[in-house]
UniProtKB/Swiss-Prot annotation:
Organism name: Euglena longa (Euglenophycean alga)
Pfam families, sorted: Ribosomal_S14
GO molecular function: structural constituent of ribosome
Biological processes, Gene Ontology terms: translation
Ribosomal protein listed as a keyword: yes
Locations listed in the record: Plastid
Annotated HAMAP family: Ribosomal_uS14_1
Family of this protein: Belongs to the universal ribosomal protein uS14 family.
Ranges in coiled-coil conformation: none
Family matches, as NCBIfam families: PRK08881.1 (NF006477)
The protein's name in its UniProt record: Small ribosomal subunit protein uS14c
Length: 100
């Protein structure tokens, strides 16, 4: 299981991304639409003034139960280990072990 501090840091990043999402998208649209080079530089400078963790590319998918960052199944929100255990015990409806 991941450290609680790392999981909390990821939660904080998610909230910052959510908070600044509309502003970031608005400024990015303005940068694409602007014809003046200096205005583009100014808008880019404004974009850089946002908190570093408000950028969505700094988010990392983590398992809902354990916080494990690798082997993550997006559809279920679980890591491969937890997914396997839950599927084995029948806790994921519709998931069956394949056999052919």
């Amino acid at each position: 299981m991941s450290k609680k501090s790392i999981i909390e840091r990821e939660k904080k990043r998610k909230s910052l991304v959510k908070k600044y999402k509309n502003l970031r998208n608005f400024i990015k649209k303005e940068i694409k639409n602007e014809l003046n080079f200096f205005e583009k530089i100014f808008l880019n400078f404004k974009l850089q003034k946002f908190p570093r963790d408000s950028s969505p590319c700094r988010l990392h998918n983590r398992c809902y139960l354990t916080g494990r960052p690798r082997g993550y199944y997006r559809f279920f929100g679980l890591s491969r280990h937890i997914f396997r255990d839950m599927a084995h015990y029948g806790l994921l409806p519709g998931v069956t072990k394949s056999s052919w």
